[in-house]
């Protein structure tokens, strides 16, 4: 039984990697990178920013965040890479995931969600854990879900455009997505001049970031 499961696993991953385009140079490196993105994907289409929590940006310092969530920005870039290289199914699942997380009122949109679409991602510090190389605090949850990051929707809208340009759906699918796109556009037009936290997720006051203005233009 164990050997059969092993063979099935091999067949699955060989079939998955065979769907991608072949490259004359760096093919092995590209393949390993795609496998990493795939391993960070959930069956419902969500893509995690990382599989880890509380690994410090610098050992001994306090910027130790929980990245085990689906950021619209990060996930859109990951899915666009998979899509352009031959994995349309990943993009299709992600489109369904984001539609399941969005609601009609545009002011409730978030920059990130839990892997099952959870909206409340309250950050908690685990004082009883010492952290990686004594880098405290150790956190679960991420309060960045409250933040405004004006670049996020630009990445998502670019992915939606790329997807429907190459994969036209049914009329019902397109109409459902169009309702969401219109609502996103309303949010962007209202917020793009407003200071925000940017992709750096600063925890102080909001600022004006050029990257966010550019993504608003997108």
Features from the language model and the residues they span:
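Acidic, mature catalytic/reactive cores of soluble proteins
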Residues: 1-218
